[in-house]
Amino acid sequence: MKKLLVLVMVLCIGLSWVVSQEAQAAGKEPYVIGVPVDLTGPASFIGKPVEAVIKLRVDEFNKAGGINGRPLKLVILDNESAPAKTVLNTKKLIDVDKAVACLGYSSSGTTLAALETAESGETVLYSHASSDKIWIPTKKWVFNVVPRTMEACTPMMVDNLIKQGAKKIAYIYIDNAMGQTGLEAFNVYVQRIGIKPAIIEKYEPAATDVSAQITHIKNSGADGLFVDGLAADAALALKTARELGFKAPINFGYGVVGPEFIRLASKYGEGVLSTSLRALVAKELPDSDPQKKVAVDLYEKYTKAFGDFSLYAGHGWDSISITAQTLAKVDPNLDPTKEEDLKKIRSQLRANIEGTKNFLGQNGIFSYSPDNHNGLPPGCYVSVVVENGKWTLYKRK
């Protein structure tokens, strides 16, 4: 009986500690985190998993007592995959909602549109998009969590095509900020390794027919194709190529990695290659990989809560995790509801993010500096292949 009483007392103490931690955070005004993210429109397949994982992480932080004894409060706004809407959302989050930081920007076009608003509003903008123009040249208030296209994707996919036997590689890209960044990286890399593209084609973001471009590619004599786009348009390019009789290997930029592309590509998706962050194939990583533990943790939590894992969940995990870690170093006596204190919080947070070193994230190991607001080294991503309707770690046979 005494043992049972002791056990009950221990459980009660533990429960009261958890409750007190949440109560402590709930007793102070929150730090507002703005999340302008694409929940509708062409980039929604990126935005939805980002929203999901940010909510998941913030719930974890708040249950642990918040940051500096304050809860984190999310204000989530749908950018609708539209640059103009993104600018309006960013301005509202900064001026009306008094966000200490804004994170979740899903695409290059929407992110680029909002840069000036964040800079003039002196508030951290954390981008989840790939264009180098977002952070080169360095903007004081803008940071990124996505590896450079030149370092994360293009060389790996071109090299894989060459190893698959391609000698005349064609390239087709979506004609927007993301695709144009990909084109620049492709041109730089093929020139570096001394090969001439068979042909380069492009298509509009809203394209529903790319048969003309694929016909040009087929007639060029290309024996390998690199497609740089997002899930729906890239799947369209793949299906069109196969239906028009293009039988050579086709590889993709990392804009396709997720369950949406596999669903849209259907039978044509089997065997295609792309690149991904490690969490997508977490359990296949060697134990020696320093990111395996955090990757497995995210994969298991995400799939348990939401089902199929998405590459883009890692972007959200990194931005909210770094934000929370660096927000904890801000002067805890500053009140985010007071205008002058809010300015100081934003400024200290920015400086703390810029000073982040060796943060073990999903997209890589981050070390920012005044001259580098991307923070990621080469070699962050791994090659993946669709096998039996799932993305798996690519191991060249």
Describe the residue ranges of each PLM region.
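Extracytosolic ligand-binding ectodomains
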Residues: 4-397
